[in-house]
UniProtKB/Swiss-Prot annotation:
Gene3D superfamilies: 3.30.160.810, Translation factors. SUPFAM superfamilies: Translation proteins. This is Large ribosomal subunit protein uL3. PROSITE patterns: RIBOSOMAL_L3 (PS00474). Part of the 50S ribosomal subunit. Forms a cluster with proteins L14 and L19. It comes from the Bacteria. InterPro entries: Ribosomal_uL3, Ribosomal_uL3_bac/org-type, Ribosomal_uL3_CS, Transl_B-barrel_sf. Belongs to the universal ribosomal protein uL3 family. HAMAP family: Ribosomal_uL3_B. One of the primary rRNA binding proteins, it binds directly near the 3'-end of the 23S rRNA, where it nucleates assembly of the 50S subunit. It holds the Pfam family Ribosomal_L3.
């Protein structure tokens, strides 16, 4: 069955494995995960849990009302006896019997050695050319060349008389939802609500990431 949790990417560091191997890891903090809703096949047509992450900022300290949450959001969170959440995600194909409304989902959901998929929003690079954005080759950089980093031909002449859709051209790069599959959980620190993931994960520091059981875990 699938397991899932939301967290924030803290950064990267290195740890030593049992055999002395130096392993690059990404530190993900995953606290304040609360089950907001349970969905069952009988009622909703599929099994899933809805998890909220991080409380929305209140209007003022000690106030019951929330500046950044409307009444539907407050009512939805109230059913789980919790505060309105900033991020809400749904995890399908889970064993809903293992979860209760308002239950906190902690990092011990995963164990050392688990194979996971991590989803995040890639770093935004702004407007970039075709070479950086799509990996196209450049022209000669000599003084006699008139073609250095230009994208080159984008289509045919009179036969088509247009540029086809999907042509790789300069444009906005990054800021896309990216999933890196088959990463290994190196360590789970329940005391600090931290998961160490082997390798790098998408997004900048403090970026939101979604950790789920690997959909291809049998392939590694």
């Amino acid at each position: 069955m699938t397991k899932g949790i939301l967290g924030r990417k803290i950064g990267m560091t290195q740890v030593f494995g049992e055999n002395g191997e130096l392993i690059p890891v990404t530190v993900v903090e995953a606290s304040q995960n609360v089950v907001l809703q349970k969905k069952t096949e009988e009622v909703d047509g599929y099994n899933a849990i809805q998890v909220g992450f991080e409380d929305k900022q209140a209007y003022k300290k000690g106030s019951k009302s929330n500046k950044y949450a409307n009444k539907p959001a407050e009512g939805h969170a109230k059913k789980a006896d919790t505060a309105p959440k900033r991020f809400i995600r749904e995890f399908r194909n889970v064993n809903v019997d293992e979860y209760e409304l308002g239950q906190e989902v902690s990092v011990d959901t995963f164990e050392t050695g688990d194979i996971i998929d991590v989803t995040g929003v890639s770093k935004g690079k702004g407007f970039q050319g075709a070479i950086k954005r799509h990996g196209q080759g450049r022209g000669p950089m000599a003084h006699g060349s008139h073609f250095h980093r230009a994208p080159g031909s984008v289509g045919m002449a009179s036969d088509a008389s247009k540029v086809f859709k999907g042509q790789k051209m300069p444009g906005r790069m990054g800021g896309n939802t990216v999933t890196v599959q088959n990463l290994e959980v190196v360590q789970v620190d329940t005391e600090n609500s931290v998961i160490l993931v082997k390798g790098n994960v998408p997004g900048p520091k403090k970026g939101l990431v979604e950790i789920t059981t690997s959909i291809k875990k049998g392939n590694k």
